[in-house]
């Protein structure tokens, strides 16, 4: 993964004192960039509620994504051993540094300046974020796919996105995101947050969710699981069989099957030799295996919108048994 530019500042602040004055100062200096999702949480009660729900321990390192002017940051600093704030806008990073300069918690804050999605993250125990809406999905998957995922994440999202995280099979909002996240973590709704609690106010309402990773972590390859779900949820209300008829999907599965055969033959024979059928016959083999799996599992006429984790696990296992892989 490419490393984003990384810069550290030493910093912290009075959690109750400078919220209003800091915002007035910022408004006089520059305009918030809503294209970067800069909607600053201005309600101190909501900010404190979010931090309290994280259950921060005095020994915890907390990652905050999109700290903005620091209304959450200063409260986190009061409870955590260290705060790592990931901020893309240099202006915000500078203002946050000023806000906490000279305070007792000054040395507890590091700021990572750059694109969060491209940044290689250090170890952290907890994540808190007033999430820029355009990175909601990448942020969730990046957190869950960390070598050592955070114990808990308290994340603010657009209301509809939050409801997708919580959706169950059969719900109208149930989708690949729902099935994927719920495999790796338990998700609960914490609170609704009105758009009037932000400056400038966004066009939509928000919700805060709590994501706690499952322990032990499911013994499943993340990319294999995600690869299967991508195919099944391309058209979630169509049959599973219909999703596997795409030429692009067949090409991917055929390529992966050839790799599987090559690896299996090399392990058995001590070399890379294998019999490679012509294109048409290999495609027919893959199609036949797909039909076999869907028929034997009984999922051919099922729809992804109605399937739960157990169903998808059965499907993934059956495909692996015939040598078909998704990553």
Curated annotation (Swiss-Prot):
CDD domains: AdoMet_MTases. One of its GO terms (molecular function) is 18S rRNA (adenine(1779)-N(6)/adenine(1780)-N(6))-dimethyltransferase activity. Its EC number is 2.1.1.183. It is an enzyme of class 2 (transferase). Residues 10-20 have a biased composition (Polar residues). Pfam families: RrnaAD. Belongs to the class I-like SAM-binding methyltransferase superfamily. rRNA adenine N(6)-methyltransferase family. One of its GO terms (biological process) is maturation of SSU-rRNA from tricistronic rRNA transcript (SSU-rRNA, 5.8S rRNA, LSU-rRNA). The lineage of its organism: Eukaryota, Fungi, Dikarya, Ascomycota, Saccharomycotina. The keyword S-adenosyl-L-methionine applies. The keyword Oxidoreductase does not apply. This is Dimethyladenosine transferase.
């Amino acid at each position: 993964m490419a490393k984003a530019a990384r810069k550290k500042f030493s910093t912290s602040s009075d959690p109750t004192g400078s919220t209003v004055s800091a915002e007035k100062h910022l408004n006089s200096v520059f305009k918030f960039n809503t294209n970067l999702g800069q909607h600053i949480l201005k309600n101190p009660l909501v900010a404190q509620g979010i931090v309290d729900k994280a259950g921060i321990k005095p020994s915890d390192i907390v990652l905050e994504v999109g700290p903005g002017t620091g209304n959450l940051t200063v409260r986190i600093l009061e409870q955590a051993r260290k705060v790592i704030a990931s901020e893309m806008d240099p202006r915000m990073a500078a203002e946050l540094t000023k806000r906490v300069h000279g305070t007792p918690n000054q040395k507890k804050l590091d700021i990572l300046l750059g694109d969060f999605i491209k940044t290689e993250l250090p170890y952290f125990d907890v994540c808190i974020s007033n999430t820029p809406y355009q990175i909601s999905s990448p942020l969730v998957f990046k957190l869950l796919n960390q070598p050592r995922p955070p114990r808990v994440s308290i994340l603010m999202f657009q209301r509809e996105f939050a409801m997708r995280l919580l959706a169950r099979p059969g719900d109208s909002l149930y989708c690949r995101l729902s099935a994927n996240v719920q495999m790796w973590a338990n998700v609960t709704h914490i609170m609704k947050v009105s758009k009037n609690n932000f400056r400038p106010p966004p066009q939509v309402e928000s919700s805060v969710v709590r994501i706690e990773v499952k322990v032990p972590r499911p013994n499943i390859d993340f990319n294999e699981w995600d690869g299967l779900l991508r195919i099944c949820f391309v058209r979630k209300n169509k049959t599973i069989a219909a999703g596997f008829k795409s030429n692009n999907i067949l090409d991917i599965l055929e390529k992966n099957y050839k790799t599987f055969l090559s690896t299996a033959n090399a392990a058995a024979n001590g070399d890379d030799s294998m019999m490679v059928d012509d294109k048409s016959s290999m495609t027919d083999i893959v199609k036949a295996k797909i039909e076999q799996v869907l028929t034997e599992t009984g999922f051919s006429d099922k729809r992804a919108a109605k399937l739960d984790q157990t169903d998808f696990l059965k499907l993934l296992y059956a495909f692996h048994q015939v040598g078909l892989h998704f990553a």
